[in-house]
A protein has these predicted regions:
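Terminal-region recognition feature
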Residues: 1-206
Length: 206
């Protein structure tokens, strides 16, 4: 069993036991002649909401300050999704880091979590992992005017365009393709995600 597979089993165990969504897996240092490089491995396993994402961003900030020579950040992801705006914020945060970003789907990357996965320069999935894309939804409670509903509809359309743009940028399919897929609601296997260009590599069990 390779290290990536062992990591996936560890996360499955932690989720079953209800443990915290944030883990610093490993900080690996390597000496390269005159300088030292650091590879940081961390997990995001939980809903994409403000509390979880803020904690995640703060932890990465702490790690990058502690290890300024970091050359790579690996993010292991298993998430049911959540808030699109918060996911986009994390996407941009990861993109702005001055190191290689590697995202790994260790179980399921659904809904808004796909935006976080897309931030990876290297995007990896385990063979049995999956991705789920669907239409933007919003829960509304209370009384609303026509203008209120129209405003919400415009916001949902804008978020749909935002997600489709991000996925088109990292894949070999255009925005229209991803919008159609979102409208239908579609579960993607690792192999299908690789065919679409969303995944760069599938890590086989060894």
């Amino acid at each position: 069993m390779n290290r990536l597979t062992q990591t996936a089993f560890m996360f499955a165990r932690d989720l079953a036991q209800g443990r915290a969504i944030l883990h610093v897996i490993m900080v690996a240092k390597q000496e390269k002649k005159d300088n030292q490089t650091t590879d940081i491995k961390i997990s995001f396993t939980g809903s994409v909401n403000e509390e979880n994402v803020r904690a995640f961003i703060n932890e990465i900030k702490n790690l990058t300050e502690k290890f300024p020579n970091g050359t790579a950040l690996t993010v292991y992801i298993s998430s049911p999704g959540g808030n699109v705006d918060i996911a986009v914020e994390l996407f941009h945060f990861l993109k702005l880091l001055d190191c290689t970003i590697r995202t790994v789907n260790i179980s399921c990357v659904n809904s808004a979590a796909i935006i976080i996965f897309a931030a990876g320069t290297e995007r990896i999935s385990l063979p049995c992992s999956s991705f789920y894309v669907h239409s933007i939804t919003k829960n509304l409670n209370g009384n609303f005017t026509t203008n209120d509903l129209l405003r919400e509809a415009r916001e949902m359309a804008a978020n749909t365009d935002k997600v489709a743009t991000i996925l088109a940028d990292v894949s070999n399919k255009n925005k229209s393709y991803w919008k159609r897929l979102m409208q239908k609601g579609c579960l993607l296997t690792s192999q299908k995600a690789k065919e679409l260009g969303l995944v760069n590599d599938i890590s086989e069990f060894k």
